Amino acid sequence: MIFIRNILVTLFLFSSLLSAKDANNNPEKVIEDFFYHFNEMDINKINELWDLPITYFVGGEIIVAKSYSEVVNYENLKKEGWSYSKINSKNPIVSQEDFAIYKTNFTRFNNQDIELISTDTNLTLIKRGDYWKLKIAIIPINISTGR
């Protein structure tokens, strides 16, 4: 009887670990992590969230990059008044086993918490192995990337 209990406890713990792994890597978590690392200006962490090449459609411009440092220039963004960005909403448009598109609304703020701009972006994510990665960002307006 103790043997069966030990097996059940082991299976429970193993399944808990698997679901914790999934909870830490799903499209919404990747989007949240992206905004967190964007605000931290951590290019290396941002690069880890993307499936290369990074593809950005911003207004009428298309940016294809090997690193997020080719997409954004933080020094120029700060000169333009940017201090941080905040997600207002993220809603799945398409959600499949290995592909997802999220409509994400976000706002940029200055260092006095005054809104600079709000916009929607469509973020396409793909699953590579066990991990979700950002693939394409489509922002319909000409929002500055600091470039």
Functional labels for PLM-detected ranges:
Residues 2-10:
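Sec-dependent signal peptide recognition
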Residues 11-44, 48:
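Short, low-complexity N-terminal intrinsically disordered segments enriched in polar/charged residues
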Residues 34, 46-47, 54, 71, ...:
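Hydrophobic pocket/interface hotspot
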Residues 39, 108-110, 127:
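Beta-strand elements of well-folded, non-transmembrane domains
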Residues 50, 60-61, 91, 104-108, ...:
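A mature extracytoplasmic/lumenal domain signature
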Residues 55-64, 80:
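A short gly/proline-enriched turn/hairpin at secondary-structure junctions
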Residues 71-114:
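Surface-exposed, charged secondary-structure patches
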Residues 118-147:
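Short beta-strand edge/turn micro-motifs at domain boundaries
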